[in-house]
Amino acid sequence: MNAAKVLEDLKRRFPNEPEYHQAVEEVLSTIEEEYNKHPEFDKANLIERLCIPDRVYQFRVTWVDDKGNVQTNMGYRVQHNNAIGPYKGGIRFHASVNLSILKFLAFEQTFKNSLTTLPMGGGKGGSDFSPRGKSNAEVMRFVQAFMLELWRHIGPETDVPAGDIGVGGREVGFMFGMYKKLAHEFTGTFTGKGRELGGSLIRPEATGYGNIYFLLEMLKTKGTDLKGKTCLISGSGNVAQYTAEKVLEMGGKVLTMSDSDGYIYDPAGIDREKLDYIMELKNLYRGRIREYAEQYPGVKYVEGARPWGEKADIALPSATQNEINGDDAKKLIANGVMAVSEGANMPSTPEAIKVFQEAKILYAPGKAANAGGVSVSGLEMTQNSIKLGWSAEEVDEKLKSIMKNIHEACVQYGTEADGYVNYVKGANVAGFMKVAKAMMSQGIL
């Protein structure tokens, strides 16, 4: 395989999809050496088959707002690869959603799901609809219209969606209800459901908790842990909230959180009481993070910025893709950051990743570090299939074990000659090899 040529061909065939190209380039650049040890892969044109989605559904979603106006949005579902299990990946509702972003997310999801060792393929879906500022009734009407198109393409053994940015328990509940009405069946077609619908305990917490479990495994390699360490967290949604919760539980100090308007810096630290305030502000009142600075004296609020210029020991990007650029990464290194562990999907640009790796700090890519969410989704699928529910303690122990195993796989495939662990390479090669072998065993499809 010539990675540069493969990428050039993809850019020619699928122009104007920069996020998708970025995700493919990151994977190809790290697996090329391992791939070329297997000439049978080239003979089967494996890399091209793996880079291009199995299928993409694109559709119009028409709904009526509270004023009686007819609104139109675009809906998508990218079914990327099902070599090791049914398509699995979230649904995102955000104004920025487009096909390029969803193709990148589905591509990443394929390898992330492979790393968990659970039988799940990769997919992703969503819409450019934003729930922000919409009434509960408007969100319900949109979701029901969205499901009128999507329902026939999903199912417990075909494609199992979940939540993502803009899609929480409320939206998953509406989707599940509409699917049940249309399909005439009560099955585990969605994960991230409420407990009353067959959802799993620890699922809301899983991505954030899993990120910290992975971080702890990395820190162990340096003979340390989180006690007394200061952390920068971006975002203030589900992932950021439970990342912060687990940091506090492990003895760390959270200095920042953010939203799309700006970030807060609390030199005293965001403690349990303050985190509860943020959870209530965001989950119940759907407020803005600046209100935290109005609530607590001594807190700095920076409009229109991200927290990466602040001094801390650890950075935990938990908001969105490409939120840390090369300049941000240089600031983090200059300020003494020893570890970056990604709760969001691809939050660091290629330039930022290069800075982290050249500085030889601990850097965990999202496909490894944030695999906790989809891991517990997989455990939810298992519980649904056997018609049983596990305790929170059981699920949490399984999550810890999965994250530890992912870390071990990254170390196995990513340790370089000088002993530095390239977690990007390790995650990509480990995830790729399982999918590649499964595809080869199934013939040319």
Predicted stretch roles:
Residues M1-A23, M218, S318, I333-L445:
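Adenosine-phosphate binding glycine-rich loop
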Residues H21, K37-A44, T117, I154-G163, ...:
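Flexible, glycine/charged-enriched surface loops at secondary-structure junctions
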Residues E40-Q71:
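Structured beta-strand/loop patches that form or line metal/cofactor-binding pockets in enzymes
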Residues F59-M120, K124, D128:
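Phosphate-interaction motifs
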